[in-house]
Amino acid sequence: VGILGNQDYMDTPFTSTAYTSKLIQDQQARSVSDVLQNDPSVRVARGFGNFQELYVVRGFPVFSDDISYNGLYGLLPRQYVAAEFIERVEVFRGANTFLNGAAPGGGGIGGAINILPKRAPNEPLTRLTLGAENGGQGMIAADIARRFGEEQRFGVRLNAAKRAGETTVEDEDRSLDMFALGLDYQGDNFRISADIGHQYHFIDSPRPSVTPGSVIPSAPDAEDNFAQPWTYSKEKQTFGTFRAEYDFSDAVTGWLAAGMREGEEKNLLASPTYVGGGATSASLFENAREDDIWTGETGLRGRFQTGAVSHQWVTSAAIFDSEERNAYATSAAFAGDLYSPVDVARPPYATGPFASGGSLDDPGLVGHTRTQSLAIADTLGFMDDRLLVTLGVRRQGIEMRTYDYNSGDRASSYKRYENTPVTGVVYRLTDELSVYANYIEGLVKGDIAPAESGGAPVVNAGEALAPYVAEQIEAGIKYDGGFVGGSLAVFSTDRPFSTIENGVFTDGGEQRNRGIELSMFGEPLYGVRLLGGVTLLDAELTSTQDGLNEGNHAIGVPRTQANIGGEWDLPGVPGLTLTSRVLYTSSQYATLNNDLEIPSWTRLDLGARYRMVIDDHDVTIRARLDNATGRDYWASTGGYPGRNYLVLGAPRTLSLSATVDF
C-alpha cells in the first residue's frame, strides 16, 4: 500500500484489488487495459488525439504516464504496456498522494495502478505460448526462469513476446516486440532486485477517435476502419528499475529504489470531427517525442511498542525528473465520411502561426518536470491491533518548466509545495469482517494563468496556481471468509479546476464525484469462481465559471458500471473450464451542457480452457470470444479532461492460444 508497504487487505483503511499473472494468462490479456476490464471501478478510454491507454478510476483519469512500476512513477511505456512480463496488476481505489506521491502526469485523483514484474519461482520454468486471433494477428511468447546458488538465493526470469498481423479492425496492423529480464537475490537480511525491459510497438492505419459536433453519430460497424492509410503510431521504450531492502534489525527495514526510462514516439494521425450526415473533417497531425526519465525513492520502516499501543512507522523521500522533447506539424482540413471512408492522399504541411513547432527530425526540449517529497506516518494499534489508526503527512514539491517549440526559450515555469495528509481508521469486528474510514488527498499541478480568455485579458497572466488539492472522504466494510470476499465503500472526492472570475484566473471550479462501490471475489461453490462488482457514480460540476453548467454531470463518467466474471470447472471433464464475463456501462454525457450523450452498452465475453498432460508436459489450450454478440457501440467519450472524443468498441474477437511447460 504505497509507502506503508505490504499490508493485510483487511487491516488497511483503503480498498484495492490485485490481478495475478494467472488471470492475465488465462484471459489471454494483451495489455494492462485488457486486465483492468475486470474491475468495476475502472473504465478504459484513450488519450487525446493518440492511442495512449487511459484508465478512468472512480470517474477520474489515470494516464498511462502515471502507472507505477514496482512502486516508481513514469518508467513504463507511455502509450501501451504489454502484459507478458507482469506478475501482478494492483489497482488502488481513491486519492493516494500521501501513499505514492503526486502523479507526474496529473492523474491519480480517483485511484492508482501499480505493476509488479515477474520473479523466478522456486521451481524451474520453461514455458512457450503460441496464439492467434481471427483477424490474422499471431503471437509467440517465452517465459523462462531459474534459481541458482546456495539455497537457490539468486533468481533470473526472462520474458519475451512478439505479435504481428492484422487485427479484427479492417486494415489495421499491429506489431509488438517485448523483452524483459528480472534478477533477484534473497539473503538472510538483504534483498535486491533489478529489472530491465524493452518494448517496440507499431500500429499501421490505427482506427482513430471521433470528435462529435452538434450530434452523436451512430456507431459504425465495429470492424470498420475510417483511418487514412498513411497514418501510424510507433513507440520504442527502454526501461529499468533497481530495488534493495536491508533489515537493520527484526524491527527496522530500510529500502532504496531507482529507475529510468528512455522513450521515442512518432505518430502520423488524422482524427476526424463529425459534422453531420456522415460527413467528417480531419487534419493531419504528425509529432515526434522523446522522453528521458529518472526517479528514486528511499526510506525506513519499523515497529515498536509504547505500553498497550503498537506502532508501525515509516518515513521516506522520493524524487522524479522528466525531460520531454517534442515537435509537431499539421495540415489544412480535408473532408471524409464516417460510414463510407475514402482514402485521401497525404496532405502537405500547413504554414502559418501554430501550424507546426520544432523539428520532427530533431525534437527540442519543451518540458521539464520534477517532483520531490518527504513523507512520515505512524499506524497506531489498540486493543491488540483490532483497532488501527493511521496518521501521516507528505510534503510534496512540484516543479515544471515549459519551453517554446521553435526558439527553445523558456515559456513558463512553476514551483510550488503543498502538505498532503492522511487519516485512516480500521476496526476488526471479527477475523473475517472489518470496517474502515479515511480522509486522504490527491495533488496535481496547478495551471498557469493564460494571457487572455475569450478575447479579454487575464489580470494575473503568468501566475502559477497552487497545486490542486482533491479531498476524499470514504467509509466502507470488508469481508474475507477464505472462499469468498468483498468490500462495500461509499466515497466523495472534490477536485478543483481552473476558472476565470472577474478577469482573474483562479482555482474556483470544482467537480465532485460521489459513489458507492461493491466488489466481490471468490469460490462460493466448489469449481465455481466469481469476480466482479458494481460502481454507482454521481460526477457533478459543483462550481463553474459564471455558474454555467453548474449542477451538470461531468463528461465521460457513467452513472453505473458493472462487471461480473465467472469460471466453472466442468464436472466429469477434468481440466476443462468454461468462462464468461459481462460488462455494463450506462450512458455517458459528451458535452458539459449535457445535451449530448452516448448510449449505454453491454458486452458479453465467453471462453474456455483445457489443461492436460502430454509426454509429461503440462499443456493448456485456451479460447476466448470477446464481444460475443458482435455489438457496435461507442465505448467511451473523453478521458482527457475537457475533451469529448468518442472511441468505438472493439469488434467480435476470437483468440486462441496453446501453452506448453517444458
What do these predicted regions represent?
Residues 243-247, 251-259, 263-271, 436, ...:
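Membrane-embedded beta-barrel scaffold of Gram-negative outer-membrane proteins
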Residues 485, 490-494, 507-592, 659:
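Gram-negative outer-membrane beta-barrel transporters
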Residues 240-263, 283-404:
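Face-selective signature of the C-terminal outer-membrane beta-barrel domain
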Residues 1-123, 475:
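Acidic, small-polar-rich N-terminal luminal/periplasmic segments of exported/outer-membrane proteins
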Residues 202-215, 321-326, 426-474, 479, ...:
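Surface-exposed extracellular loop regions of Gram-negative outer-membrane beta-barrel proteins
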Residues 163-167, 180-247, 260-291, 334-363, ...:
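Acidic/polar loop-and-plug regions of large Gram-negative outer-membrane beta-barrel proteins
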